[in-house]
A protein has these predicted regions:
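FAD-dinucleotide binding site
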Residues: 9-10
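Switch/communication elements of ASCE P-loop NTPase nucleotide-binding domains
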Residues: 114-222
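Extended helical coiled-coil dimerization/tether regions that scaffold
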Residues: 21-160
């Protein structure tokens, strides 16, 4: 938002003004600016972020990753395709749910040759189908954690991802897929620091970007 010489920057994890940015430049650790560039994906954050987002208008500032999924096709397609790699089903934002937007699990809704009297009737039929679908927040921690990582990874304004045990709650095949997704997603301008005890996470990373992987073994001294 532009207010003359003062500008407002709002989004997921940050709400800053141009004066704040100047002030944080003198902070050794950059204050709240860190949240614009660094994503911290511990277990709690991953599970919480998969809960439904508050409903907003299409033009409002996006304050939750699900808002990007709901209102921008590229994010919707990306997260659905990567979720399907692990679980065989797609993710669909339910924007007609009411006061929040959950992520539904199932097939994309397509009406073939059915005729509707108007657009409102078609949307009501679409809504009725999604009401029968499972929702991410009601599933086990494996699906919620996997979805939470995807919701962070798709936001390309982050430069650094701190990911604590991404294999948590996942079976080995899904952990391998997660390693591959992380390796495939990060651009040359991004990096991830991953704490893991999983061979499958490491194997997945090595399968897609071996030249970028550095493995550091930490041994606790008694």
């Amino acid at each position: 938002t532009d207010h003359g010489t003062y500008q407002k920057y709002s989004g997921f994890g940050y709400d800053l003004g141009s004066y704040d940015i100047d002030r944080y430049k003198s902070d050794k650790y950059y204050g709240e600016l860190r949240s614009v560039f660094v994503a911290y994906l511990n277990t709690l954050n991953r599970l919480k972020i998969s809960n439904p987002a508050d409903l907003i208008s299409r033009k409002a500032a996006k304050t939750h990753p699900i808002h990007y999924v709901a209102f921008e096709q590229k994010y919707r397609q990306w997260i659905s395709a990567n979720f399907k790699k692990a679980f065989g089903e797609e993710l669909i934002p339910f924007t007609q749910n009411g006061n929040n937007i959950p992520l539904c699990i199932g097939k994309q809704v397509k009406f073939n040759d059915e005729e509707f009297s108007d657009e409102q009737t078609r949307q009501e039929a679409y809504e009725k189908v999604l009401e029968t679908y499972k929702q991410v927040q009601d599933q086990g921690d494996g699906i919620k954690s996997f979805t939470g990582i995807l919701l962070y990874l798709m936001l390309d304004y982050y430069s650094i991802f701190l990911i604590d045990e991404p294999e948590s709650f996942l079976h080995p095949p899904q952990a391998n897929i997660m390693g591959r997704i992380i390796g495939e997603t990060l651009s040359d301008n991004q990096q991830a620091f991953i704490s893991t005890h999983s061979e499958e996470i490491i194997k997945g990373l090595l399968e897609v970007c071996p030249e970028r992987v550095k493995v550091i073994r930490i041994t606790r001294v008694k």
